[in-house]
Amino acid sequence: MLRYSVGFDAREFAPWKEVDWAIGYIREHAEQWHIDPEQIVTCGFSAGGHVAFAAGLMGQNKPNAMVLNYPAVQLPNLPGVDYMIKLLTGKDTATEEDSQYVSLLNHVTKDAPPVFIAATAQDLLTPHGALPIAQKYSQFGTNYELHIFQYGPHGYALANEVSADGSLQNLDPAYAQWHELSVQWLHRTLGKPEHGEKNTSMLVKHMKQLGFLPADAEEKPIL
């Protein structure tokens, strides 16, 4: 999980730079952490989907695939977009050129990493994010998979007990299928990961140091 900058700390494209750095850092330590450097995937939701998508289109350390849930990719269509663009660019006044630059669809090419996209037809916040990505990818003949579920608001996350936070409104067995569907797609796209008898102690140790895991997290072998 990447704790990227938000609000005023997001100026000058800080979130984009941070996810790019994170991917590079993981690849640098791939052997030490028993990670396949060619099976790194970004996954993001809403604004996080924007960051995860930007990593694949704009970064120097591109992921091998991307999984996007109800991503915010067409910023000119979102409420408060001028403020968002000012934050990202660090400018007091956003120009049309700035607006087009942060609209990630303008950066899709035939070399874009494969992408899996999930969204709902009832999403009122980012209603037109998923379909245009699929259309762009189709235009370039690039690998993608798209799932539009009929029901559900913006922000379903996993749509199960893990992310529902006790709210029945955030439970939806239909939308919850996106996770397994994305895993199946990743296996078809990147191949299934090879599991061995390696221990994750070093990875867990570093994740504790970075604050991504609690200090008492157990060091278990990869199954």
Language-model regions, residue ranges each:
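Conserved alpha/beta-hydrolase
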Residues: 1-9
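Alpha/beta-hydrolase-fold catalytic nucleophile elbow
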Residues: 3, 43, 67-70, 118, ...
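Alpha/beta-hydrolase active-site loop
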Residues: 10-31, 177-180
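Primarily recognizes the serine-hydrolase "nucleophile elbow" in alpha/beta-hydrolase
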Residues: 21-82, 96-99, 198-205
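Short beta-strand/loop motif that positions the catalytic acidic residue
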Residues: 111, 116-119
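Acidic beta-to-alpha connecting loop that harbors the catalytic carboxylate
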Residues: 120-124, 151-153
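Conserved alpha/beta-hydrolase "acid-adjacent" motif
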Residues: 124-131
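C-terminal catalytic histidine-bearing segment of alpha/beta-hydrolase fold enzymes
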Residues: 138-223
